[in-house]
Amino acid sequence: MPATISRADYAAMFGPTTGDRLRLADTDLIIEVERDLTTYGEEVKFGGGKVIRDGMGQAQTTRAEGAVDTVITNALIVDHSGIYKADVGLKNGRIAKIGKAGNPDTQPGVDIIVGPGTEAIAGEGRILTAGGFDSHIHFICPQQIEDALHSGLTTMLGGGTGPAHGTLATTCTPGPWHIGRMLQAADAFPMNLAFAGKGNASLPAALEEQVLGGACALKLHEDWGTTPAAIDCCLSVADAMDVQVMIHTDTLNESGFVENTVAAMKGRTIHAFHTEGAGGGHAPDIIKICGEEHVLPSSTNPTRPFTVNTLEEHLDMLMVCHHLDKSIPEDVAFAESRIRRETIAAEDILHDMGAFSIIASDSQAMGRVGEVLIRTWQTADKMRKQRGRLAEETGDNDNFRVRRYIAKYTINPAIAHGIGHEIGSIEEGKRADLVLWNPAFFGVKPEMVLLGGTIVMAQMGDPNASIPTPQPVYSRPMFGAYGRSVENCAVTFVSAAAHEDGIGARLGLAKETLAVTNTRNIGKSHLILNNATPQIEVNPETYEVRADGELLTCQPAEVLPMAQRYFLF
């Protein structure tokens, strides 16, 4: 006879199931489980007196015969593709199967075989997401990588050589020599890393040698001179060598206006950084380009979301980051021209509409590397409070909005940079770069981070305690973050040209190198749940922003979730 159990008791034992709802952290965002791929009455769970025991939920199957390396049981998957419950099997550092785990000799419907060689991670009552991808990194100091990992990021792309003044302002690793040194340094870190070369040149040779030297992208930055000629040259090299171009346009409008920049692009794909403009770009109307099909628009996190403190903190940030002098009137005017409450307010709404597609940090250069996820969900919560439910929602939940926002730091930057076939979502065959969350701490403090199927970070108590939970409990590096394991759980992304030329062997790299691909034959329409292309107009006198004729404005937030209450310890 089948047993009956209350929803509350079931959720407490096996985690929420179809129709159950839960809150994300302390936000107003409510998600609902859409479907459950496990089987009622046949759930697998590890522990004393539980299911994953020899001859019960654990089969005799060897690894060679098909048993997985790791099973994450009864996890609530939150992904751009949906919000659903499943067991997840990991093998060879990748997601082998999403479905029902157990012993096929004793249980029906098993498609993830648990064997004697299988480790178990309890996903009951936990949320599982893909690792985050920050595509706007200034590699100013290596300590950023630890902060990023402990926030739920597993991939970082950007440029720099350390605290050189070029790196303090621009995300470029200039020249093949510097790129080589950064690729060699990448071997030491439990993080997927990728580097952008300097794209500012009017002739192609110096750009081509950087791509061949391992750069997987090229960055055009106004501090190096983002002229129409440089834009055209950089995009031509990118088209020929299949790498993405990121652009920070000309704030001062010295070499042209936004229309001249768009004309120089000639409809070619480009990733536009901080498209609102506070982080840099044609003043006051760079935000217009988010309506172009060939532009992949992103935000950096200091303007996310618009709050009562946003404008004030930006001026000082800008003066430091761009090597400006408060005693020079022109420098002050340059800084003030970039900070506009009207365009920052509009940016909130454009994200909620799906017209801005990506959120990244701009680490230590007008951005906070450990706050990509927090700022994304704070924006989603602010828009939920101010704009209500999205028209696309189909139930008494915020599932569509949550899927839209998680895509901004997972699958969309991955697609934009040619690595969406490897990372960015929870899909069979992709790398097992995964983050496990307690729902109460979602987006703030991960419970566990896996990189290539290996645990690299987790919340951990006193190492001298008799059990792992006594205080102080905080995120600490795990075994995957040490020794030779680092070389095998993380990868380095490079251009196809460098990969085919044997960049790994040439530089003696220990980490596997993977080539980026298909960065050029894409447009905004390829970005998931964030591909709206409204006609944007900016009033040059008032800075008011309109999308398809509708004024975009909202009030700054005075209080945010996922903030001080989470950082008392």
Curated annotation (Swiss-Prot):
Pathway listed: Nitrogen metabolism; urea degradation; CO(2) and NH(3) from urea (urease route): step 1/1
Domain of life assignment: Bacteria
Keyword terms: Cytoplasm, Hydrolase, Metal-binding, Nickel
Co-factor binding details: Binds 2 nickel ions per subunit.
Cofactor: Ni cation
Positions where N6-carboxylysine occurs in the chain: K219
PROSITE patterns: UREASE_1, UREASE_2, UREASE_3
Enzyme Commission number(s) of this protein: 3.5.1.5
Keyword presence, Nucleotide-binding: no
Residues the entry annotates as binding substrate: H221
One protein family per Pfam: Urease_alpha
PTM summary: Carboxylation allows a single lysine to coordinate two nickel ions.
Location relative to the cell: Cytoplasm
UniProt-listed GO biological process terms: urea catabolic process
Alphabetized InterPro entries for the sequence: Amidohydro-rel (IPR006680), Metal-dep_hydrolase_composite (IPR011059), Metal_Hydrolase (IPR032466), Urease_alpha_N_dom (IPR011612), Urease_alpha_subunit (IPR050112), Urease_AS (IPR017950), Urease_asu (IPR005848), Urease_asu_c (IPR017951)
Entry GO terms, CC: cytoplasm
Single GO MF descriptor: urease activity
Binding site for Ni(2+) 2: K219, H248, H274
PANTHER family, alphabetized: UREASE
Subunit composition and interactions: Heterotrimer of UreA (gamma), UreB (beta) and UreC (alpha) subunits. Three heterotrimers associate to form the active enzyme.
Family membership noted in the UniProt record: Belongs to the metallo-dependent hydrolases superfamily. Urease alpha subunit family.
Protein's name in the database: Urease subunit alpha
Taxonomic placement: Bacteria, Pseudomonadati, Pseudomonadota, Alphaproteobacteria, Rhodobacterales
